């Protein structure tokens, strides 16, 4: 036992962290089923989540090595998690960054939400968001005139970069194809495609064309409607791209994808929002989490008192690939 323990501590903290993270990988497994079984605590289901958590855990490891060189195991480093996160708050990191780093360490150390020692992160307020707000340094290196078609394409479809860079001509779906795809997915028990098709047909019953967002954030697949004044030019480009060819061979790295997703979300909300005066606060609708809530969403924080159509918010969330309605409101829907 002593020799094995000695051998363990010869590994650096980085090696110990890497080994632990490798053991948590569950790529390709169903997170939905794991949630039902209550076994998601020590698993990471997405490659992008793994890479993000790995990066932020390495920041923590570097801090431990610098400030607590006597610590030789990740197990003993656990007691410094709160100290590290408090330092990050003092350094002026955004609430989003703090929440992300806390999520990474909570997952790594399996710190449950009801654990009294779990770090209490600062609230994330819409007014504090800096991403895609105002002029940024990268905007100086991006010509809106030269990239006009790319911008319009993004505003009509709400892409994340990873999906746009992999988009093929075959990813255009008309309503008939969605219906056929749903039948095929049911035969093959392809649950992700079944949900994508059912959501498209249910939430966007008046739309004719959709883009397949294949294996987006979290490995999710969805069909989002093509909307807005540039809809026809998007459909034309898709139809004139051969099925296996990339629609865009190059996507400028300075393109503000998040900002154009916000344009898409805002346009979509306005398209589906009903006049608030026609809605009834007492009328309940079923939300994504299975709970019944008023069809009127009342904003908080800096927009306290503003009322929005919860049904339209739900449609926007589905199109963006988010489950939580507050994400659509806080990060995307603007200037209403």
Report residues per predicted region.
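Basic, Lys/Arg- and aromatic-enriched nucleic-acid-binding interface segment
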Residues: 134-167, 299-300, 307-313
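Short functional hotspots where side chains directly engage DNA or cofactors
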Residues: 179-180, 210-213, 291-336
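Short, charged phosphate-coordinating catalytic segments
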Residues: 154-204
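Short, basic/aromatic-rich helical patch in the C-terminal catalytic core of site-specific tyrosine
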Residues: 164, 258-273, 316-317
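Intrinsically disordered, low-complexity domain-flanking/linker segments in eukaryotic proteins
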Residues: 180-195, 280-303
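DNA breakage-rejoining catalytic core of tyrosine-based enzymes
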Residues: 119-145, 218-229, 242-243
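N-terminal core-binding DNA-recognition domain of tyrosine recombinases/integrases
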Residues: 2-3, 26-125
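C-terminal catalytic core of Y-nucleophile DNA break-rejoin enzymes
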Residues: 215-236, 244-264
